Amino acid sequence: TGRKWKQVARQKETVRYVVCNGDEGDPGAFMDGSVMEGDPFKLIEGMMIAAYAVRAENGYIYVRAEYPMSVARLRNAIAQLEERGLLGDNILGSDFSFHMHINRGAGAFVCGEGSALTASIEGSRGMPRTKPPRTVEKGLWEKPTVLNNVETYANVPKIICLLYTSPSPRDGAT
């Protein structure tokens, strides 16, 4: 994940995107839905951190069609954050702006693949593209794109917290 983010941040193109794959097409898999419904703020916070790291102004959550409750909870969380000035333009008076968008999947298993997912968000048929280029170079709308799944984004805030609260080797800890 860190390598992907670093690759996107280093691209010359200034327009960049952060995308979350919440399609979870595997039969019987419900982890993404449980995170999006149980704590959508955790997912959004992780995406905001990614956006800040790569200087992206727009993020997209691609949610499988069978998760209407996830969409409702995400929309509610986004609205609350926008009302409080934590999402949108000039967050907390800073020069950081980040807008969140939700796209509903069409139920195609293939859209779990990165290039098929970005094609679907763009309004095209969700078909995989040949690689290279990878999404970090030319993803959504042919722009550098960070693409991670729900679990990855949801764990980013916790990882950062652990890094800043754990003793470091410089403190004599191992």
Q: What are these regions, as identified by a protein language model?
A:
Residues 1-16:
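N-terminal glycine-rich phosphate/pyrophosphate-binding loops that anchor nucleotide-derived ligands
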Residues 1-5, 107-118:
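Conserved phosphate/anionic-ligand binding catalytic regions in large, soluble enzymes, centered on
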Residues 20-32:
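Gly-rich Lys/Arg/Thr-decorated short loops/hinges at beta-loop-alpha junctions or inter-strand turns
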Residues 40-52:
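Histidine-anchored nucleotide/phosphate-binding helix
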Residues 58-71, 75, 106:
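Conserved short loop/turn motifs at secondary-structure junctions
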Residues 73-107:
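A glycine-rich helix N-cap at a beta->alpha junction
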Residues 117-152:
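Polar, glycine-rich mid-to-C-terminal structural blocks
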Residues 164-169:
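Conserved small/polar residues in nucleotide/adenosyl-binding loops
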